[in-house]
Amino acid sequence: MNLNYSEEQTMLREQIQKFCESEYDFYKREDIVKSDSDFDPNVWKLFAEQGWLSMPFSEDAGGLGFGAIELSILFEEFGKSLVIEPYLATVVLSGSILDKSSYESKNQIIEQICSGEMHVSFAYAEVNKSYDYSSPNTTLDSGNCLNGTKTLVLNGANAQKLIVSCSQGDELTLVLLDSNTKGVSTNSFSTIDGQSCSEISFENVQLDSLNIIATADEAKRLIDESINLATLCVSAEAVGCMESCYLKTLEYTKGREQFGQPISNFQVLQHRMVDMFIESELAKSLLIKAMLEVNNNSDDMFKHCLLYTSDAADDDTR
């Protein structure tokens, strides 16, 4: 089994690295966090020009047809620079659902996502529903009237369209609607890492059959695949954070002197650096295994990957 990256994948990594180094330093990130929009429209436009917004979409829909490996490369590099642009919300979560669905109007929306003109958010989480997304409390009645509340909607304040999971009778259903539709209200807040989240309420929002993306088993499959892919991307982001933290700490210990010698000579710090390196490499290995399992859509594999990388990243950054 060849686990080496292809020439194209290596070039992609180098392209993203150069962009982040020149266009997205920590001060740039801080300016974005403090801004009202929670992302930089100019940076988002550059993402589109680089082709990154088109990466995971099928070629039939106007995308580049890249897969989980390329997305993982992208998010690893994003993790190194703590990029907070709403790529996960629009391209991964919402984009995956649209791209893999049989929704008739999906290509037009995907085209606008790829060009950077449109943000789409996936509203699936609800208060007191744990991690079971198969039976939402948000309802769509027989007259296609939507009622309910979603929480932790990534980039909800900036999205022009929303994909919402709901129950229509006993069937799980996914609907697509404009965020400014009458009856939709948004309360936005910032997450601990500076990203934008929203609680979105739907009160007697009138839809029709054209708003329905998928129902029943297809809706569940689309949600599962979308969340699994997003879990993989977040895990890759954590791996990138860990690697950057390790390299910066290593550089610091070599340059900082105490008692007439670099502190990297002190055994206790050497042990700490070794521990950081081992954690980082183990996380990378688990990420690679998850990338190889992505087509099997193994929920447990992605959950274990995220759990380990999150814990390891937390340990490494303390």
Q: Which residues does each predicted region cover?
A:
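Glycine-rich beta->alpha junctions and the first turn(s) of the following alpha-helix
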Residues: 3-12, 52, 79-80, 185-281
